[in-house]
């Protein structure tokens, strides 16, 4: 039945996933957001190359590489607003393994499938 969890313990959150039939619209604009800096625990960590001082990507925004290969939806944002760090999480090692060689690659957000949080509202 699995490990016993205490009342306040946060169990491993399930990562959001895109609909199976999702495909990047051919003419959808993509914009650079950061670079893959680490791959840990079924997650791809992206250091933003753009300050988050005015806005940061909202969870569920769709990320991809320059060649338009889909990385996945944004799972969480952490770090300082000046240098936000984004995390895309996978629910299976198989999904994660597909990206094991992507360290150092530029990451983009899909403009029509992404939203921002303006930092004035979270400061």
Segments and roles (model prediction):
Residues 25-97, 101-104:
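Short beta-strand/strand-turn micro-motif
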Residues 2-8, 64-71, 116:
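Proteins with a high burden of low-complexity, intrinsically disordered sequence enriched in S/T/G/P/A and R
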Residues 94-123:
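Helix-rich interaction surfaces within compact, conserved domain-sized segments
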Residues 1-30, 123:
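Long, compositionally biased charged/polar stretches
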């Amino acid at each position: 039945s699995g490990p016993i969890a205490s009342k306040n313990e946060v169990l491993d959150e399930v990562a959001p996933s895109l609909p199976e039939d999702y495909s990047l619209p051919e003419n959808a604009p993509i914009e650079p957001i950061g670079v893959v800096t680490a791959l840990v625990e079924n997650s791809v960590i992206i250091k933003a190359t753009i300050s988050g001082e005015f806005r940061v990507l909202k969870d569920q925004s769709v990320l991809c590489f320059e060649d338009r290969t889909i990385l996945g939806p944004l799972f969480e944002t952490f770090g300082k607003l000046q240098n936000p760090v984004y995390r895309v999480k996978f629910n299976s090692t198989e999904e994660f393994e597909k990206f094991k060689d992507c360290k150092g690659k530029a990451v983009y957000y899909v403009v029509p499938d992404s939203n921002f949080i303006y930092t004035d509202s979270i400061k």
